[in-house]
């Protein structure tokens, strides 16, 4: 029988639980989530268990990172299933605050970052997103005080933004990126995949196929612009409307013109039906 994790929903209870977990100088890893957990989240938990002696998972659907026209109300809430997954993985602690705990009356602060947060990717189409992400992640780091925190590479710009924030503000948290977990047909696992109709689910694999084809052509010596144009045609033909499909420096997210400019990451965001998906691959 799996040991049940400690579930806390208030800051005093969190502090008491952390004091217990931290006994004997145990190292602590945090996996921040918004719930609706899938195998990608589970892979983060398993990596966390390899990297630290204790693992905490936060589940908080952060209203501050959703614009008024986005899917906050419709975002899947699957507490029972999430708890079952985390219990099976023998997580030590679940931090599950509500919005009033995270943003109490009179809350008037925000962490705003530059650098990767202004790369012209997600920030161009979701201008309030990273202000919401950095603020809530900064609060989670202050509340949980982990030694390390794990984020998936699927949200690649977010990973770079959070890592930059942690370094710049001397937060004492090592931000660790984990490889994208994909379905058997290549689609990157995402809580939003459940929004896809059967037809759109089948077509959605074009995102990964397009990225991998472009990466292959760039590695073979084709110009980046030409490789991306071919992949854009493939993705558009599958029914997607592309927000961006770009080659960026894998660390700074600055635009790159050729492989000589440094390690390259190809990133895409596109909508099929009403579902917006993101993905990326290394070159």
Swiss-Prot record:
Residues at which beta-alanine binds: 65
Keyword ATP-binding (UniProt): yes
Record-listed ATP binding positions: 34-41, 152-155, 181, 189-192
Cellular compartments per GO CC: cytosol
Localization annotation: Cytoplasm
Coiled coil regions in record: none
Entry superkingdom: Bacteria
Family affiliation: Belongs to the pantothenate synthetase family.
Note: The reaction proceeds by a bi uni uni bi ping pong mechanism.
Protein name: Pantothenate synthetase
């Amino acid at each position: 029988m799996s040991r049940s994790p400690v579930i806390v929903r208030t800051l005093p209870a969190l502090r008491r639980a952390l004091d217990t977990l931290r006994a004997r100088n145990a190292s602590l890893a945090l996996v921040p989530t918004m719930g609706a957990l899938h195998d990608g989240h589970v892979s983060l938990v398993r990596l966390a268990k390899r990297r630290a002696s204790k693992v905490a998972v936060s589940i908080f659907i952060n209203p501050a990172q959703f614009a008024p026209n986005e899917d906050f109300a419709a975002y899947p809430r699957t507490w029972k299933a999430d708890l079952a997954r985390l219990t099976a993985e023998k997580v030590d602690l679940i931090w599950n605050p509500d919005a009033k705990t995270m943003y109490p009356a009179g809350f008037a602060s925000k962490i705003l970052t530059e650098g990767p947060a202004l790369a012209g990717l997600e920030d161009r189409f979701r201008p309030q997103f990273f202000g919401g992400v950095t603020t809530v992640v900064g609060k989670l780091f202050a509340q949980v005080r982990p030694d390390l925190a794990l984020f998936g590479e699927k949200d690649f710009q977010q990973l770079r933004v959070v890592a930059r924030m942690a370094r710049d503000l001397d937060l004492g948290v090592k931000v660790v990126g984990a490889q994208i977990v994909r379905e058997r047909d290549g689609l990157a696992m995402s809580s939003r995949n459940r929004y896809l109709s059967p037809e759109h689910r089948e077509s959605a694999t074009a995102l990964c196929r397009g990225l991998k084809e472009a990466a292959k052509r760039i590695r073979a010596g084709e110009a980046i612009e030409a490789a991306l144009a071919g992949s854009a045609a493939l993705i558009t033909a599958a029914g997607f409307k592309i927000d961006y499909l770009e080659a960026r420096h894998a660390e700074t997210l600055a635009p790159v013109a050729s492989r000589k400019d440094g390690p390259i990451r190809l990133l895409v965001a596109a909508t099929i039906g009403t579902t917006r998906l993101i993905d990326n691959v290394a070159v």
